[in-house]
UniProtKB/Swiss-Prot annotation:
Protein name according to UniProt: Antifungal lectin PVAP
Any further remark recorded for this protein: Antifungal, antiproliferative and hemagglutinating activity is abolished by incubation at 100 degrees Celsius for 15 minutes. Antifungal activity is abolished by incubation with trypsin at 37 degrees Celsius for 30 minutes.
GO MF annotation list: carbohydrate binding
Organism: Phaseolus vulgaris
Family recorded in the similarity comment: Belongs to the leguminous lectin family.
Keyword Oxidoreductase attributed: no
Keyword Glycoprotein in annotation: no
Length: 10
């Protein structure tokens, strides 16, 4: 559920 958060940190 953190795909959006991970994508931003990537």
């Amino acid at each position: 559920s953190n795909d959006i958060y991970f994508n931003f940190q990537r």
